[in-house]
Every structure is written in structure tokens, then in C-alpha cells.
Amino acid sequence: MALSCANRPQLIRSSQKDEQFQGSLRGQAHEVCQAFAGAKKWLQWRKEIELFFDLAYYCLTTFSGYQTLGEEYVNIVQVDSSKRKVPSLFQRAALICCHTLLPYLLDKEFVRLEHELHIETDGVRLSHSGLSSGSHRRSWMWKRVHRKIAALSEQQKKTLIKAVYIVRQSIAFLRRLHLAIFYMNGAFYHLAKRFTGINYLRVRRSAGDDQIVNRSYTLLGAVSLFHLLLLLWVQLNSFQQRQEAQQKWKLLRRMSYQRAPPHEKSYKRRAKCTLCLEVRRHCTATPCGHLFCWECIMEWCNTKAECPLCREKCSAQKLVYLRHYR
């Protein structure tokens, strides 16, 4: 019996069903860990526990040569790029690593790198889930990274922070671009399957008309691609405007008075910015009410859209410059 390629609705439903079962496993793990270890330990090791259950799910299904529950639900099977035989053991292992382990490692290492850079640049210790600044053990690699970061200049550290932010945003952009391409040609729903060359064949023919379904998904892909390009243009335009605003601000700051009036000295001595640890100049308020220098909080929000003190979400557009603030 000749098997045809799985269509886009089958691939999407299969992935959604797998995510549903994985979410159920994570929920049960949440209850068990909270019952035996407490909420604090669960929050500390939440990502690692979820990774363990995701790996267990795919090792018991894909790695062992069986269908996942989602694949079984829509009657599709994995095949290699030739579409004549099942993927090899190496391909299945690579698929599991790229789909579960690699995103976890990238996210963890990028967060840790940002953590190190912000500590060195601003002197502010950031509390983040899974990262306690005083308790996590440094590996030999991160000791070397820490020494390299400490040897950088302040400008180099700020540039590296922006580079890390751009890389993380680029990964998210790549995922959305890949999803739009999937809607248009329907080959690979996940990036990991594209990298490993794993396709799907359906065991039995679907009842619907594939041509009508494909046309609707192609239209959805075109709309998604247009929206993504529009979003990219807006981001680039916003970045250019921020760069111009920073240049104007630096020029204005050089032209401003170097010494505050006498009646402000006693107050200004107490009003210091917690980012630069200097006298707060051109006070700017976040939506949560904390005050910083305009330049300091603008640079912070351009790399991390949250308040440095209370971690509340805060974009650069929501900052309020306080004129004539005493």
C-alpha cells in the first residue's frame, strides 16, 4: 500500500496532542514535587524537572521506535528523508536532543550570560528563576567566562548585552519564520525535524480535500509572513529611533550644567540612581514608581523590558520623564 505524506492539519493536531499529554505529565510532576519537596524546591528545579519528563516521554516513544500519542492519534508515522524507511537510531536521538535539550540549554546559558553581564556592568544582582546569585556553583567553563567578562570595558559589556538580546530575539524570529514557511509548504512543523530530515507519512487517507485545506494554510502562511516582515520593519525602525535619541541625549547631557543649584544639593546627595550609583539626573519614573536616570533606565529597558528593582514588566515607551522634579 502506497502511503502519502501527512498534511498540515494532521501535523498540527499531532503536535498539539503531544503537548497536551506532556502538559499533563508536568502537572502531575508539579503536584508530586510540591507534596514531597515543597514549593521552593519545585520553583528552583522546575525547568529541569519538566525537561526530564519531556525527555522521558520522547525516549519511551520516538527513541524506542514507537509512535508518540499525538502521532498515533492522527495515524501518521515517522520516516527519513527518502520516505522509504523509518529514521535511524541516530536521527531519532538527534531529534530528541534538538527538540527538548537544545532549547533548554540555550535559554539557560543565555540567561546566565545576561546575569553575569548585568552583575559586572551595573553592580545589581538579579534574582531569576533557577539562578541564585550566591548559591549556584560555577563550572570551570563559567569561571573562565566570568574572568573574560571582568576583563572587558564597560562599553564592551554593554555591547555584549545588546548582542545577547539580539541573538535571543533572532531565535524567536527564526521560529516564527519557520512556522510561516510550514503553513505555506507543509513540510516540517518543528525546526528539529527540519534539521534531522524526519518526515511523516499518513497510514490512512483523510476524509477532507487536501487541496482546499492546503490553499487555506498557504493563505495563512502568507499573512503570517507579511506580519512577520512588518514586525521586523517596526523593530528596526524603533531601534534606529532609539539610537538617534541616545545620540541627542548624550549631546544634551554634555551641554547641561555640571553642578546642581545650591538648594538642590542636600536633596540630590540622597537621590541616587540605583543603576549607575551616582546622583540621579533627569529623573525618570517607571510604571511601578521607581526612579532612575533617564539614560540609565533607557539603556536598561532596551536590553531587558522590566524594572531593575521589582522585575515588573516595563517597556521603554512607558517610561515617564519627570520635568522640574525636586
Swiss-Prot record:
<keyword id="KW-0812">Transmembrane</keyword>
<dbReference type="Pfam" id="PF13639">
    <property type="entry name" value="zf-RING_2"/>
</dbReference>
<dbReference type="InterPro" id="IPR001841">
    <property type="entry name" value="Znf_RING"/>
</dbReference>
<feature type="binding site">
    <location>
        <position position="273"/>
    </location>
    <ligand>
        <name>Zn(2+) 1</name>
    </ligand>
</feature>
<dbReference type="GO" id="GO:0008270">
    <property type="term" value="F:zinc ion binding"/>
</dbReference>
<dbReference type="InterPro" id="IPR025654">
    <property type="entry name" value="PEX2/10"/>
</dbReference>
<keyword id="KW-0472">Membrane</keyword>
<feature type="binding site">
    <location>
        <position position="310"/>
    </location>
    <ligand>
        <name>Zn(2+) 2</name>
    </ligand>
</feature>
<feature type="transmembrane region" description="Helical; Name=TM1">
    <location>
        <begin position="8"/>
        <end position="37"/>
    </location>
</feature>
<protein>
    <recommendedName>
        <fullName>Peroxisome assembly protein 10-A</fullName>
        <ecNumber>2.3.2.27</ecNumber>
    </recommendedName>
</protein>
<dbReference type="GO" id="GO:0016740">
    <property type="term" value="F:transferase activity"/>
</dbReference>
<dbReference type="GO" id="GO:0016567">
    <property type="term" value="P:protein ubiquitination"/>
</dbReference>
<feature type="topological domain" description="Cytoplasmic">
    <location>
        <position position="38"/>
    </location>
</feature>
<feature type="topological domain" description="Cytoplasmic">
    <location>
        <begin position="123"/>
        <end position="147"/>
    </location>
</feature>
<feature type="topological domain" description="Cytoplasmic">
    <location>
        <begin position="237"/>
        <end position="326"/>
    </location>
</feature>
<keyword id="KW-0653">Protein transport</keyword>
<feature type="transmembrane region" description="Helical; Name=TM2">
    <location>
        <begin position="39"/>
        <end position="60"/>
    </location>
</feature>
<keyword id="KW-0863">Zinc-finger</keyword>
<feature type="transmembrane region" description="Helical; Name=TM4">
    <location>
        <begin position="148"/>
        <end position="185"/>
    </location>
</feature>
<dbReference type="GO" id="GO:0016558">
    <property type="term" value="P:protein import into peroxisome matrix"/>
</dbReference>
<dbReference type="InterPro" id="IPR013083">
    <property type="entry name" value="Znf_RING/FYVE/PHD"/>
</dbReference>
<feature type="topological domain" description="Peroxisomal matrix">
    <location>
        <begin position="186"/>
        <end position="216"/>
    </location>
</feature>
<comment type="function">
    <text>E3 ubiquitin-protein ligase component of a retrotranslocation channel required for peroxisome organization by mediating export of the PEX5 receptor from peroxisomes to the cytosol, thereby promoting PEX5 recycling. The retrotranslocation channel is composed of PEX2, PEX10 and PEX12; each subunit contributing transmembrane segments that coassemble into an open channel that specifically allows the passage of PEX5 through the peroxisomal membrane. PEX10 also regulates PEX5 recycling by acting as a E3 ubiquitin-protein ligase.</text>
</comment>
<dbReference type="InterPro" id="IPR006845">
    <property type="entry name" value="Pex_N"/>
</dbReference>
<keyword id="KW-0962">Peroxisome biogenesis</keyword>
<comment type="similarity">
    <text>Belongs to the pex2/pex10/pex12 family.</text>
</comment>
<feature type="binding site">
    <location>
        <position position="307"/>
    </location>
    <ligand>
        <name>Zn(2+) 2</name>
    </ligand>
</feature>
<feature type="binding site">
    <location>
        <position position="296"/>
    </location>
    <ligand>
        <name>Zn(2+) 1</name>
    </ligand>
</feature>
<feature type="transmembrane region" description="Helical; Name=TM3">
    <location>
        <begin position="90"/>
        <end position="122"/>
    </location>
</feature>
<feature type="binding site">
    <location>
        <position position="288"/>
    </location>
    <ligand>
        <name>Zn(2+) 2</name>
    </ligand>
</feature>
<feature type="topological domain" description="Peroxisomal matrix">
    <location>
        <begin position="61"/>
        <end position="89"/>
    </location>
</feature>
<feature type="zinc finger region" description="RING-type">
    <location>
        <begin position="273"/>
        <end position="311"/>
    </location>
</feature>
<comment type="subunit">
    <text>Component of the PEX2-PEX10-PEX12 retrotranslocation channel.</text>
</comment>
<keyword id="KW-0576">Peroxisome</keyword>
<keyword id="KW-0479">Metal-binding</keyword>
<comment type="pathway">
    <text>Protein modification; protein ubiquitination.</text>
</comment>
<feature type="binding site">
    <location>
        <position position="276"/>
    </location>
    <ligand>
        <name>Zn(2+) 1</name>
    </ligand>
</feature>
<dbReference type="GO" id="GO:0005778">
    <property type="term" value="C:peroxisomal membrane"/>
</dbReference>
<dbReference type="InterPro" id="IPR017907">
    <property type="entry name" value="Znf_RING_CS"/>
</dbReference>
<keyword id="KW-1133">Transmembrane helix</keyword>
<keyword id="KW-0862">Zinc</keyword>
<keyword id="KW-0808">Transferase</keyword>
